[in-house]
Amino acid sequence: MLLSFMLRLLLLDLDNTLYPESRGMDRDIVERMNGYVARYLGISTRAALALRRERAKNYGTTLEWLTVEQGFTDPESFFAAVHPEGEEYCLEPDPQLLRALDAVDLPKAVLTNSPSEHAYRVLRKLGLSDRFAAVYDIRFNALRGKPHAEAYRRACEASGVEIEETLFVDDMPKYVRAFLDLGGRGLLVDEADRFADEGLPRVRGLVELPGYLAAP
């Protein structure tokens, strides 16, 4: 396991990491995303869902797929449609999460493939705005986010640390694995125990993080 004194930064994903997937926010985001793709391509929502599942998995984000394969050039309209004001209605502060984060004596930052306005809404609703020194969003990474190596490197460089000194926590195996491949330390949030076969260090939620770091 890890010892916190070996680390200089805790770098956290946002969605389905700082709050449980079971809250339903990701479901709402995906529905809006499918609707946007359907309107842009002029196809049914069901067809958009199928096409996203087939093609977007080859990219870091749906936005990157649309840009590369579909000639998409209006990311701001995409962000506005997928992340409207009030989207955070289903979230609420979690005292256990607050205690867990406060128990980890490391600077903390967010690395997300979403836009900053979404990230700040989520952090405010969760009561976590003052727990993070920085938010590195998709614009910070020139719309090429995780799992591109430069996304992780930029975040660590901006935080003044090396990748090897950073623990990155995410709910997506491919994003955690990409960070591990760079020599960093990675941890997967696997709330529903779906990824036992991935061979990655795992916790069910961030409330387990202090115990994970303290384990021998």
Regions found by a protein language model. Name each.
Residues 22, 37, 55, 67, ...:
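Generic anion/oxyanion-binding catalytic loop in active/binding sites
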Residues 2-8, 102, 109, 115-216:
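Asp-based, Mg2+/Mn2+-dependent phosphohydrolase catalytic module
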